[in-house]
Amino acid sequence: MLSRALSQVQPGYGEAPADDRVQTLAYRCSVPFAGAPRVITVVGPTAAGKSALSIALAHETGGEVVNADSMQLYRGMDIGTAKLTSDEREGVPHHLLDIWDVTFPAAVAEYQALARAAIDDVLARGKTPLLVGGSGLYVRAVLEEFEFPGTDPAVRARLEQELVSSGPAELHERLRVSDPVAAEKILPSNGRRIVRALEVIELTGQPFTAALPSPTPYYPSVQIGVDRATDDLDERIALRVDLMWQAGLLEEVRALLPLGLRDGRTASRALGYQQALAEIDGDMTQDEAKADTVRGTRRFVRRQRSWFRRDPSITWLDGASPTLLADALALTR
């Protein structure tokens, strides 16, 4: 899907004078802003039912799915990411699945460019793009004006070494002094984000928050959030993890080892994969690995909810409601 999306995007498509946001949106969509084709987003926590809703919406709207799950971007990481099989996609075109090797470090800036190319391609063919996933930063990077500062390998390597030697708490305190607002938004345990924030501050001389998304939309969009009662979601997570192991997660991980999974800074830390590696290495029993995956996923769900609930443009629907599809369709019309 990625190759098709990129090959069909015409050179210069989507470029327009930068001094007029309305003109830019109208130009990219080739129609006046008020009636511009919209991107439909389906977001929410893990296991809430986003994928099922997106397939149903795609059938009703003539839509195509653009993946916004950061782990489903990785080739061969299928079972542990709950990636839909070809049959489960029911003929709905999906973009940005299986595009990165497991050794590739997650790069929001690269994802942004690829996702916008895919969305522009879908719009150019008169279809509806459905941006679907639980990676909040990836979604915002696509939907909003968000320019990424450059990187410096030497600065990044030095900060990552400091992270190893000093721990995330010390670097988080340094971030708090340099950019209190960013420190409030980044968990003290999130070493990768802390390192990136400090790198941006050092390279630009500006607060990291200056690089965060602005509320100015890049695309007109309808944002649908899918969630469930916590007890219901907890049960679904536990069942999903159990089914992951039954479906052959360990075999999937073993097959990825020769491809460099252990060296993948992002992929090797993915929920389920990190624990499966520990089981393979004898550091955890299977029961311990599964229990740790459940706990980690529930913690991740809390972070997802915290991120998405701050966005007032998302309309929330109950994933367990029998009228979920009808309610979602009503929002798109």
Segments from the language model and where they lie:
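Phosphate/pyrophosphate-binding catalytic cores of soluble transferases and nucleic-acid-acting enzymes
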Residues: 2-8, 12-13, 20-333
